């Protein structure tokens, strides 16, 4: 039986996952859930690092959740589905406890983002979506550099080839006009300051 086949199992795993997180002492009222969407090498980790310096946010990491789930995932093809299920339930539990969070992961599907928004707002939180903008060629150049670092053992990670990069780009559903979002432009310090200011205004309402 897989993680998604037993809701009780998911509840227990989400509680265990919350205990693995670094929870900030300070709190935003109401709590917020910051969700990201962008193609590979768009600067997600850089943005997460800077936003956690500016705001009290617990970080949900795709990489850490994959490690957490590794012994339990029923088969490889369900990995992404199970990571999303665990992340959604974990976000719910954090918001219920008044803990703000950021998901260090590109939530590619609009329906998944809509579901997170629905759950966050149902528990009294605020949903903030950030679109990470980057030129495709620039992103692939950066990705190639990261791949080289991984192959030389200078960085941990998985090498993403051109075909997989193109698949990720094609399958990423960017926010539509009906899906309000903030915009972060990779490599633009002023864009980072703007996003921080915008989140400050949202959390002050």
Report each predicted region and the residues it spans.
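Phosphate-binding P-loop
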Residues: 23-30
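Conserved substrate/cofactor phosphate-moiety recognition/catalytic segment
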Residues: 42, 46-99
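Hydrophobic anchor at the beta1->P-loop junction of P-loop NTPases
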Residues: 36
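N-terminal pre-Walker A segment at the start of P-loop NTPase domains
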Residues: 2-23
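Small-molecule kinase domains that catalyze NTP-dependent phosphoryl transfer to phosphate-bearing small molecules
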Residues: 149-196, 205
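Conserved phosphate-donor/acceptor-positioning beta-strand/loop module used by diverse small-molecule
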Residues: 123-143
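P-loop (Walker A) phosphate-binding loop of NTP-binding proteins
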Residues: 39
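Glycine-rich phosphate-binding loop used to anchor ATP phosphates in small-molecule kinases
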Residues: 79-127
